[in-house]
Amino acid sequence: GCNVQTVAAQDVQDGRFPTVASPNPENPPALAMAIEQADASGADIVIATDPDADRMGVAVRGEDGKMHLLTGNQIGSLLAWYRCMSMSELGIINDSNRSRAVMVKTFVTTGLQDAIGHHCGYEVVNVLTGFKYIAQKLGKYEEAIPAEKRRDYRRMSEEQTRALRLQYSRYFVFGGEESYGYLAQDFVRDKDANSAAIIFAELAAYAESAGKSLLELLHELFEKFGVYLEMGKSLVMEGADGAAKIAALSASYSANPPAELDGVPVSGIRDFSKGDMVDVEGDPIPAEKMIFVDLADGRSFAVRPSGTEPKIKYYLFGHGKPGEPVKEALPKVQALSLIHI
């Protein structure tokens, strides 16, 4: 079993959340007290959620004895790998039903999860940013089950609904987004930190039983599929003038897409604002002010205005070669990820 500790000062219910500047596990300072306690007690893992338990952040102890914060992309990739591996080892997903297994993620989430899903023989569906789009897919998969079979769907056990989905529809194995939101089941149709924390603890126990650290598991994924690194940048522009600048800047990428960046030719552009795209299942992708730019050297970036804040957001992606030792690949991919916008 696990020796579970909590941070006593953060156990007190207080809507002001006085122990942190922001109770958001995306922000490293939100985990500072827990990491300090982990160092004092010798704990190997820190798991933190936000107050409404939809986002989850994690820190793990490395071979150097220090705690390392994982990104939302890295946490999601470890969870995706563990789910896929478990489904195969338990015989739930096999050659007879593998074509019905699916992962659903957002376009701006790491390609490592695409690689993991495809390696396992699953369909990987990319959707727009926002968990509502993942939830829409889950609703679609439920509706594909014959009506007479799903009449009591909401009262069925996971085993019963899974059998129906594997026979008539799609079985959702894992989904998530880079902003620390994950989902591994169908009965909650939003990002769910509660179930994610349980699965991550199970993953940690698996790693311990295999004599590996979680960082070692992550590096094994990097060596198998290539090192994936992602970065995020935001430009904040407040007020009416700021909103106009954000709109103009966003529109400029569609009207005048770049031909090169950092002296590297652009190899492909995906403009989501036109509303003429479909996903791998043939479903229309709603028009969104987002553009994806792929460079000839393997880098790519996406640009989109935030839907909730006065900022324009950049998502930067770098990918190394499969099979390359992580220690050699990491510096190269880190350099590739530093796109100068």
Map each language-model feature to its residues.
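N-terminal small/polar loop signature for handling phosphorylated ligands or for N-terminal nucleophile
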Residues: N3-R55
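Short gly/pro/ser/thr-enriched loop/turn and capping motifs at secondary-structure boundaries
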Residues: D11-G15, R55, I75-L78, F131-Q136
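Phosphate-binding and adjacent anionic-ligand microenvironments
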Residues: D39, A43-I45, T49, K66-H68, ...
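A generic beta-sheet turn/junction motif
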Residues: P51, G307-E309
